[in-house]
Structure formats: structure tokens, C-alpha cells
């Protein structure tokens, strides 16, 4: 049977309630009914907190949407064109740089007047990021001016905020270049006008603002809104970049990378950036004095009205805490000791001067940060950049007695790593003794970061690691083969490894194990011996399996590095690779081990000859493979087949250069004997006596005679 038509949802309920109200008679009730006006009055009151805020939140969202300007949408043809342009830039299949430059100019011409639409478009905002990364300084500044006046809304937009961030990073080196060569730019402009005429096109229009003024305009545009931008999910990323640019800090540094962007962000710069651009953002930059003044004012405005309680709450805020980390790193690292002593600074408001020694509240706050996933990041920043006096008090009061239990915790261990990187040799030795009882549990749970840091810092500080080596040997067992399999994670056979794809957590454990083995090999004494004996205990099949593992092969390459202390170890290990050179050379990871065998046999030439002969016997297979050809070239096998004597001298290290013989300077004359030098001096004197008027010949002849013995000594 056909069903009766019924309206569903809120519309049906609304119509039913309306009919009921129309049918029912209005009855006077003795109770006072709350009206909508009274509801609004109550909502307007300061002390009233409504329980049902669903409607209010909707109104606020609608109000925010109304405040945000709408820049329009791209039509279908425009979206299709810009999508194809994005794919073309990603493929980067241009014939030359001029072809690429012309294509970028054509895209800019097509995007003229649509820049804001593209930046706010979900499908085309990535094109804007790629364009910015490939643009010239003049194009970057022109786009900067297009965005000016709209930054307050763009930095809060889900897609446009990434374009703003990319624009700031690309424009930061332009500020430094304009500071360094302002006069040269004027000369270039005059020369361009003289060459092209007054109507000729310039690479950089004369009426463009300097990049410094563009950045100052952004700060003034955002001024007065720092309070809510600090914890805004999209704007906070842009604020962090802006702070680092004003301070002249590196934008691609490892310590700053985690506070600039999340792990989920697509790395567009890896596709588009050049080596020179990458170098400019990895280094500290010189900034004008106006940036320093603006930075101080910006930090004071950001923290204005934030008392100690609010700052401590901000320390564990997932969005506000990274901004606080950048502010603290700038205050403690760039603004000098005077700013640290200032009671109005963010650092002193967060942690007062007498907190650690007299007040328990401050100590409790710092203790709570150890176990918080967000707060521990802030604590790492404080440990890394805090003044020495504060760090010593902090270590003595908070960390020293409980460093063992902190190292055992999954989150607090990262703070312990930063502490170990900064302590003195005596404190490091006492910290090792405190952490030793936790070594078995750390090994069992594969928490190897702390152990690796202890080994690295002990190598730098020349601390004693005998007790640590014994603890690791007891934790991993005395059997060398089992120990090696456990550390490097090679328990599965090759067939199992091919069929089963490793999980991310397992891969991370294997990576930490490989890094631990490399650190142990670099440390002197029993730690290196423990890994070396494990490699010697492994059969050939396990060694080849390790060599073909992309993670574990790094440890094997480290073990093969030649040094005076491991000559006997290499003499015993290298014959295990007889008959395996072709197999290793054709593998992606094994080819790196094959390359490492060249340096490993630098003082064992008879082994190097045997391995080179194996490569020569499998020449056809190696030449058919890209990896094999690379190994053939690195082992100088063409020289081995044609000029065995030159190859032997290179194998013995007498000729360290791996350049072919024709590239050498053929015009160099052979070294003269002492008799030839004496004859040259005699001839020079005789020539000088025959031509007494010549003033240049005497000194020149004398110079040749005196410089020849030094050249002879160099040749000998």
C-alpha cells in the first residue's frame, strides 16, 4: 500500500506546535511566565550564564560569518585553468628557466584581480602557495600589496592563512636583501631605464613599497586583535611566522619547525623551493631596527592583560602554547639579559624570580608540565633557552632527585633529553647513575631516546660509560646474535619481511634501535665493542639481511667506517662479504653498504682487490642496473680494468680524488732537480748582468730561483 505523506524534521514539529497554539485558548496563569525579552535581558547580564547556549552559539557563528567578507567564487573555466596550472608547476617539466618564468607570468596575468578568490579557494589555494614560492621579489611584493587591507580576515581563513604564511616566509629574505644593497638597486634601475627607455618595463616597479613597510603594515593591520588571534586555530600559525620574521630567526630550523606548522600540513615548499631559497630561510637574518621596535610592541600587546594564572593556562592550550613557545624563545634568546630580568616580561610573569626557591605553587606548575603532552613542549623550550642561573636552580630543585622516574615516563622523557643536553660533566655522571636502574624497563619498552642521548652527551663530555655498557649488556643479554636482532629489529626472515608490511610503531622502534647502535659505535670503550662483537657473531645471511634493510643498514655502514681502533674488527668482518658484492650492488639499501666497503678497505688493499674483482666479473649485470652503475662508478671500475696501477694507487689512498686523469692539469711541468735549479739561477744572473737597465728582470729571476725549491718540496 502507498504510504501517507508526512513531513519529517523540525518543520513538521514546528507546524504541529503552531496548530496546537491556534486550537488552544489562551488561559491566564497565576505563575509568572518568562518572556523572550526577559530572556534577552538575562543573556545581556554579566552574571547570567545560560544553560542552553545552542541558539546563542548559532547566532554568534552567523554574526562572525556576516563580518567575514566574501571575495567571490571562481567559475568552472577558471577553476579548470588554475588546476591545470597547479599540476604543471608540480610536474616542473619546463625546458629551461625562461620557459618557466613565462608560464608563471601568464598565470599571474590570468589571476589578476582574482588573487583573493584563489587564496580562499579550497582547490586553488595550493596553486597560490606554489606561485609564491616560485615568484620573483617584484611579484611577491606585488601580491603582498594585493593582500594588504585584508590580512585580518585572510589569516583566519582555513585556506588563505596558508597562503599568507607562505607569502611571509618568501618575503622575509627580500627585507634583508633590500637592507644590504639599497644603492645597487638604484644603479640597476637607472641602467634599466637607460637601456629600455623610460617606457621600458622594469623587473621591479619603482613605485613598489619596500618589503619592510609591507611587514609593518601587516602588524599595524592586525594590531588590536592579538587577544583572540593568539588562540585562533588558523591565525596562530601565521602569528608564529610573523614573530620569527621580525626577530630574524631561522624559519626552517629544526627547533622552530614543530611550532610553525602541524604534521598534517602539505609540504608545498619541497616541490617548489630552490637550494638558494632553502638556504636563506635556514639561516639567521639581519633585520632593520624598525623590526626590533615593532617586535617588542607586538609581544607586549600579545601579553597585555595576561596575568600569571592566564599564562599558566595558556601553557597547556593546544593552540596558544606554540605561540607562547615562540615568544619565550625570542625573549630569552634574542632580546638579551635585560629583558629576562624585566618583571613585565612574559618569562617572569609565567615563572616569577622567587618561584623555585620560596613558592610551592610555581614548582607544582612546572611539575604539571612534565606529564602534559602540550605543556612538556613549552618546558623543553624553557630548558633549551633559559638563562644559566635559572637552569641550574631548576635542575637542582625540580629535576635532579627524580630524573630517573622522569626518564621512565613517555612524555617527561623528552624534557629529560633536553636537560641532559645542557648539564655539565659532573651532573651528567650523577644523572647516569640515577637512570641506570631504569635501563631494563626502558629497553623492554623500546624507549631508547634517553639512552641514546646519554651516550651522545657522554662522548661529547668525555664521561665514563662503563656502568652504562654493563647495564645495556645485562638488559639485551650476553648472546651477541640475539642482542643484534633485538636492537636492529631483524628477527623476521626476508620472506616474512616482504609479505608483511611493518607497522608505523614497529618501524619507529627499529629506527630508534638503529640510531642507538650508531651512537654506541661512535662511543669509545665497551659500548662500541658490544655492537662489534654482535656483528661478528652474526652469520652471513643475517648480515646481508641487515644490509638490505633501509633502517638497519645505517648501523652496518657506521660499523664499517675506518678508524685506528676498529682495524682488527674490520679485518674479521670484511671477508664475510666475499661473493655478495653483486647482490648488494643491485639492492636499494645494499648499494650504500657496497659503497661503504670502499672506505672500509682503505688500509686492507688485498680485500679491496678481491671485492673489485667480483664487481668486474658481474659487469654486465651491474651496467644494466641504475644502482649497479652507481657502485661501478664509485669503485672506479673503469680505471680498474684499463689502468690497474692508477687504480691501485687510488685504492691505497695515494690519490684521494675520484676525478679521471684527463681532468688533471696537463700543463704542469715536472719537478726540476737541484742541478737544473742551479743552472737556472746562474742563467738568471748572467742575463741580469747583460741587461743592467732592466729593473724587473733581476727580481723576477731571483723570485723564480727562490720559489722553485718550495715547489720541489711540495712535489716531493
Swiss-Prot record:
Primary location: nucleus
Region of interest: Disordered: 1-70, 179-204, 656-716
Subcellular location: Nucleus, Nucleolus
Bias kind Basic residues: ranges: 1-11
Pfam families found in the cross-reference section: PUF_NOP9
One of the GO biological process terms: endonucleolytic cleavage in ITS1 to separate SSU-rRNA from 5.8S rRNA and LSU-rRNA from tricistronic rRNA transcript (SSU-rRNA, 5.8S rRNA, LSU-rRNA)
Keywords, in A-Z order: Nucleus, Repeat, Ribosome biogenesis, rRNA processing
InterPro entries: ARM-like, ARM-type_fold, NOP9, Pumilio_RNA-bd_rpt
Annotated Pumilio repeat ranges: 110-145, 305-342, 361-396, 397-433, 534-575, 576-613
PROSITE patterns reported for this sequence: PUM
Composition-biased stretches (Polar residues): 657-666
GO terms for cellular component: 90S preribosome; nucleolus; preribosome, small subunit precursor
Domain of life: Eukaryota
Molecular-function annotations in GO: RNA binding
Biased composition (Basic and acidic residues): 12-37, 52-61, 687-699
Function of the molecule: RNA-binding nucleolar protein required for pre-rRNA processing. Involved in production of 18S rRNA and assembly of small ribosomal subunit.
Family classification: Belongs to the NOP9 family.
Protein name according to UniProt: Nucleolar protein 9
Amino acid at each position: 500500500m502507498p504510504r501517507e505523506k508526512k513531513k519529517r524534521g523540525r518543520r513538521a514539529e514546528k507546524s504541529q506546535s503552531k496548530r496546537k497554539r491556534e486550537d488552544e485558548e489562551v488561559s491566564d496563569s497565576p505563575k509568572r511566565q518568562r518572556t523572550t525579552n526577559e530572556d534577552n535581558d538575562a543573556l545581556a547580564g554579566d552574571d547570567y550564564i545560560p544553560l542552553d547556549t545552542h541558539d546563542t552559539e548559532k547566532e554568534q557563528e552567523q554574526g562572525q560569518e556576516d563580518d567575514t567578507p566574501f571575495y567571490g567564487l571562481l567559475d568552472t573555466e577558471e577553476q579548470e585553468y588554475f588546476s591545470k596550472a597547479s599540476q604543471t608547476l608540480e610536474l616542473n617539466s619546463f625546458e629551461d628557466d625562461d620557459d618557466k618564468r613565462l608560464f608563471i607570468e601568464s598565470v599571474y596575468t590570468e589571476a589578476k584581480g582574482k588573487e583573493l578568490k584563489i587564496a580562499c579557494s579550497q582547490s586553488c589555494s595550493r596553486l597560490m602557495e606554489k606561485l609564491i614560492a616560485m615568484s620573483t621579489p617584484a611579484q611577491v611584493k606585488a601580491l603582498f600589496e594585493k593582500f594588504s587591507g585584508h590580512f585580518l580576515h585572510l589569516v583566519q581563513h582555513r585556506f588563505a592563512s596558508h597562503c599568507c604564511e607562505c607569502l611571509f616566509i618568501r618575503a622575509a629574505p627580500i627585507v634583508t636583501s633590500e637592507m644590504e644593497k639599497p644603492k645597487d638597486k638604484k644603479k640597476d634601475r637607472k641602467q634599466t631605464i637607460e637601456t629600455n627607455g623610460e617606457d621600458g618595463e622594469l623587473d621591479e616597479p619603482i613605485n613598489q613599497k619596500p618589503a619592510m613597510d609591507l611587514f609593518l603594515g601587516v602588524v599595524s593591520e592586525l594590531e588590536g586583535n592579538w587577544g583572540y588571534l593568539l588562540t585562533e586555530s588558523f591565525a596562530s600559525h601565521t602569528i608564529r611566522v610573523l614573530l620569527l620574521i621580525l626577530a630574524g630567526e631561522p624559519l626552517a630550523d629544526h627547533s622552530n619547525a614543530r611550532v610553525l606548522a602541524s604534521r598534517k600540513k602539505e609540504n608545498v615548499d619541497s616541490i617548489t623551493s630552490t637550494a638558494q631559497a632553502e638556504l636563506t630561510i635556514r639561516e639567521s637574518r639581519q633585520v632593520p631596527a624598525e623590526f626590533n621596535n615593532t617586535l617588542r610592541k607586538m609581544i607586549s600587546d600579545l601579553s597585555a592583560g595576561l596575568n600569571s594564572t592566564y599564562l599558566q593556562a595558556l601553557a597547556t592550550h593546544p593552540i596558544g602554547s606554540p605561540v607562547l613557545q615562540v615568544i619565550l624563545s625570542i625573549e630569552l634568546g634574542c632580546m638579551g639579559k635585560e629583558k629576562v630580568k624585566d618583571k613585565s616580561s612574559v618569562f617572569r610573569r609565567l615563572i616569577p624570580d622567587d618561584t623555585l626557591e620560596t613558592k610551592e605553587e610555581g614548582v607544582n606548575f612546572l611539575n604539571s608540565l612534565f606529564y602534559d603532552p602540550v605543556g612538556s613542549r613549552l618546558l623543553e623550550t624553557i630548558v633549551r633557552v633559559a638563562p644559566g642561573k635559572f637552569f641550574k636552580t631548576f635542575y637542582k630543585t625540580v629535576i635532579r632527585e627524580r630524573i630517573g622516574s622522569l626518564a621512565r615516563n613517555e612524555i617527561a622523557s623528552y624534557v629529560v633529553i633536553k636537560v641532559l643536553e645542557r648539564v655539565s660533566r659532573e651532573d651528567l655522571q650523577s644523572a647516569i647513575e640515577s637512570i641506570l636502574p631504569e635501563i631494563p624497563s626502558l629497553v623492554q619498552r623500546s624507549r631508547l631516546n634517553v639512552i641514546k642521548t646519554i651516550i651522545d652527551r657522554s662522548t661529547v663530555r668525555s664521561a665514563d660509560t662503563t656502568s652504562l655498557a654493563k647495564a645495556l649488556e645485562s638488559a639485551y643479554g650476553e648472546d651477541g646474535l640475539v642482542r643484534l636482532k633485538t636492537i636492529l629489529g631483524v628477527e623476521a626472515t626476508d620472506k616474512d619481511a616482504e609479505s608483511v608490511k611493518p607497522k608505523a610503531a614497529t618501524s619507529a622502534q627499529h629506527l630508534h634501535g638503529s640510531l642507538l647502535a650508531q651512537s654506541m659505535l661512535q662511543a669509545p670503550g665497551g659500548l662500541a665493542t658490544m655492537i662489534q662483537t654482535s656483528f661478528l657473531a652474526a652469520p652471513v645471511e643475517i648480515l646481508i639481511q641487515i644490509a638490505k634493510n633501509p633502517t638497519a643498514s645505517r648501523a652496518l655502514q657506521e660499523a664499517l667506517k675506518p678508524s685506528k681502533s676498529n682495524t682488527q674488527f674490520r679485518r674479521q668482518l670484511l671477508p664475510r662479504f666475499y661473493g655478495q658484492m653483486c647482490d648488494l650492488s643491485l639492492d636499494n639499501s645494499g648499494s650504500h653498504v657496497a659503497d661503504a666497503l670502499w672506505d672500509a678497505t682503505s688500509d686492507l688493499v688485498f680485500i679491496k682487490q678481491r671485492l673489485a674483482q667480483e664487481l668486474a666479473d658481474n659487469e654486465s649485470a651491474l651496467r644494466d642496473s641504475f644502482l649497479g652503475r652507481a657502485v661501478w662508478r664509485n669503485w672506479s671500475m673503469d680505471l680498474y680494468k684499463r689502468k690497474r696501477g692508477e687504480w691501485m694507487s687510488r685504492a691505497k689512498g695515494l690519490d684521494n680524488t675520484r676525478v679521471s686523469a684527463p681532468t688533471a692539469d696537463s700543463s704542469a711541468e715536472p719537478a726540476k732537480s737541484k742541478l737544473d735549479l742551479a743552472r737556472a739561477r746562474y742563467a738568471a744572473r748572467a742575463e741580469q748582468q747583460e741587461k743592467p737597465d732592466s729593473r724587473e728582470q733581476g727580481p723576477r729571476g731571483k723570485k723564480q730561483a727562490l720559489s722553485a725549491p718550495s715547489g720541489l718540496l711540495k712535489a716531493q
